[in-house]
């Protein structure tokens, strides 16, 4: 179910403060965050945000098409693995 339009989008306060300070100074730095649930807002466009995937921080460059999505959508947590091969030669 989608979030109510009466409410504002969730953005972690510390991340939003860092982005606003960088926008005022006109700087571009990598912002490290563990907040995967934060919604991407227009103030983030053009910044690189390193999102934690459970093991490491993955740098993500924010574009205008990402606005409205969550940061966690762009940092996959699972590695797709296939099934083990049932090769009879490897058993011998």
Curated annotation (Swiss-Prot):
SUPFAM superfamilies: Ribosomal protein S19. Pfam families: Ribosomal_S19. One of its GO terms (molecular function) is rRNA binding. GO terms for cellular component: chloroplast; mitochondrial small ribosomal subunit. The lineage of its organism: Eukaryota, Viridiplantae, Streptophyta, Embryophyta, Tracheophyta. Transmembrane segments: none annotated. The keyword Protein transport does not apply. Belongs to the universal ribosomal protein uS19 family. Protein S19 forms a complex with S13 that binds strongly to the 16S ribosomal RNA. It is found in: Plastid, Chloroplast. It comes from Cycas taitungensis. GO terms for biological process: ribosomal small subunit assembly; translation. InterPro entries: Ribosomal_uS19 (IPR002222), Ribosomal_uS19_bac-type (IPR005732), Ribosomal_uS19_CS (IPR020934), Ribosomal_uS19_SF (IPR023575). This is Small ribosomal subunit protein uS19c. Keywords: Chloroplast, Plastid, Ribonucleoprotein, Ribosomal protein, RNA-binding, rRNA-binding.
């Amino acid at each position: 179910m989608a979030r109510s339009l009466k409410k504002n989008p969730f953005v972690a306060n510390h991340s939003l403060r860092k982005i606003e300070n960088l926008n005022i100074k006109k700087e571009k730095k990598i912002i490290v965050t563990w907040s995967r649930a934060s919604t991407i807002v227009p103030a983030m466009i053009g910044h690189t945000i390193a999102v934690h995937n459970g093991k490491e921080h993955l740098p993500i460059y924010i574009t205008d098409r990402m606005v409205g999505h969550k940061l966690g959508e762009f940092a996959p947590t699972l590695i797709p693995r296939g099934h083990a091969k049932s090769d009879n030669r490897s058993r011998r």
